[in-house]
């Protein structure tokens, strides 16, 4: 199966594979994964699927006709919940696309999306397998995301593996958004980073960066 599973879980009750599940403030879980239909699955506290929301991204109507399962492979990424559990950010790894949502008990409302570009890929769906062959010329998207009550910090690659090789899986640009999806500022680092987190008061950023070797780095934001 052509799936890149990061922090994935199998939900036995709804028999779906999820790339990631996050708890909400409403005693539910929101999941993303290689679904045949829908962008998000909502699960109750027992792990039973109760609803499907949205659809996988698409560039145009031609891509919209590609089965959602193949598009789910091409638009893999991660979801992060706000500390209060009522907002969600969906950051695509395979392409620089990031979207912001407001959560309620029964709905996931899109507030804003930022799309730098869309990926090029070839769907490969068989009877017992599914994958999307990605072009090496694609610009990669968001490597990691850290959140606080006020802000979303998104680490951007912005590079292709064709031009940058393995360094495309690192980034030195951090875009800072509020939970409405408005871009507030951009940090440019002098070191390639692979992961980051931010203190709850938005005063300190911690990151894993490549200096002579991978090191834990600290930056004051205030």
Language-model segments: residues:
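Single conserved hydrophobic/aromatic residue that forms the stacking wall/gate
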Residues: 1-7, 11-12
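Beta-propeller blade signature
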Residues: 4, 40-46, 167-181, 220
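Structural signature of eukaryotic scaffold interfaces centered on beta-propeller domains
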Residues: 19-25, 69-84, 137-148, 197-200
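Flexible internal linker/loop segments at domain or repeat junctions
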Residues: 107-145
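Conserved blade-ending motifs and adjacent loop-strand segments that build the rim/top face
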Residues: 115-128, 179-200
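Loop/turn-rich, solvent-exposed surfaces of beta-rich toroidal or solenoidal domains
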Residues: 135-176
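Blade-level signature of beta-propeller repeat domains, shared across WD40, Kelch, NHL, RCC1
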Residues: 203-222
